[in-house]
Amino acid sequence: MAKRKVTRKKIVRKNIADGIVHIAASFNNTMVTVTDNAGNAIAWSSAGNLGFKGSKKSTPFAAQAAVEDAMNKAMEHGIKNVGIKIQGPGSGRDTAVKAVGSMDGVRVTWLKDVTPLAHNGCRPPKRRRV
């Protein structure tokens, strides 16, 4: 049998000036997705994707590293102005926002917290006793 040739999909360089940085900061991980204004993903990264494992994924340093990785990928596509949507109660949320603001060549135009708040919905998890 002949071996099949594996071809990789070529990365198409888009030229997008404006975008949205979605930061999902959970208690266990921080996920960052950079999209265009229509919501199509341009670049993404997470603390676990960068090699942080276990409890190290939830640290502020891991969140900062995830933001820098996603923004560097997005800047290859020409991102210059971004808005930030942040969701979740994680420990890396403030550090992630600061990391986006400190990137050279990127201007933050707006910031919005889109964390869903329950109006007496599901019962929350019980308090930890250590």
Curated annotation (Swiss-Prot):
One of its GO terms (molecular function) is rRNA binding. This is Small ribosomal subunit protein uS11. It comes from Aliarcobacter butzleri (strain RM4018) (Arcobacter butzleri). Belongs to the universal ribosomal protein uS11 family. It holds the Pfam family Ribosomal_S11. It comes from the Bacteria. Located on the platform of the 30S subunit, it bridges several disparate RNA helices of the 16S rRNA. Forms part of the Shine-Dalgarno cleft in the 70S ribosome. Part of the 30S ribosomal subunit. Interacts with proteins S7 and S18. Binds to IF-3. SUPFAM superfamilies: Translational machinery components. One of its GO terms (cellular component) is ribonucleoprotein complex. InterPro entries: Ribosomal_uS11 (IPR001971), Ribosomal_uS11_bac-type (IPR019981), Ribosomal_uS11_CS (IPR018102), Ribosomal_uS11_sf (IPR036967). Keywords: Ribonucleoprotein, Ribosomal protein, RNA-binding, rRNA-binding. HAMAP family: Ribosomal_uS11. GO terms for biological process: translation.
